[in-house]
Amino acid sequence: MPRSLKKGPYIAQELLNKVLVAQETRSKKVIKTWSRRSTIFPDMVGLTLAVHNGKKFVPVFVTENMVGHKLGEFSPTRTFYGHAGDKKAKMR
């Protein structure tokens, strides 16, 4: 369920501060964040954010197509190794 329009999109205040500082200084330094729930704003386009997936930080380069999505969508938390195979089929 999407967030109410009267509330507006959510962004962590410390992440917003880091993004604004990076824009002012034209810094290309990677910004680390644990805030997977923050919405991507147009101000973030062109920056690289390191989003935590629970184990490590995944670098995410923000493009125009990502605006409006959440940061957590681009940092997968689960690893899929494939379904278990049929042991009888392998023996043949």
From Swiss-Prot:
InterPro entries: Ribosomal_uS19 (IPR002222), Ribosomal_uS19_bac-type (IPR005732), Ribosomal_uS19_CS (IPR020934), Ribosomal_uS19_SF (IPR023575). One of its GO terms (biological process) is ribosomal small subunit assembly. GO terms for cellular component: cytoplasm; small ribosomal subunit. Keywords: Ribonucleoprotein, Ribosomal protein, RNA-binding, rRNA-binding. Pfam families: Ribosomal_S19. GO terms for molecular function: rRNA binding; structural constituent of ribosome. SUPFAM superfamilies: Ribosomal protein S19. Belongs to the universal ribosomal protein uS19 family. Protein S19 forms a complex with S13 that binds strongly to the 16S ribosomal RNA. NCBIfam families: rpsS_bact. This is Small ribosomal subunit protein uS19. It comes from Desulforapulum autotrophicum (strain ATCC 43914 / DSM 3382 / VKM B-1955 / HRM2). The gene is rpsS.
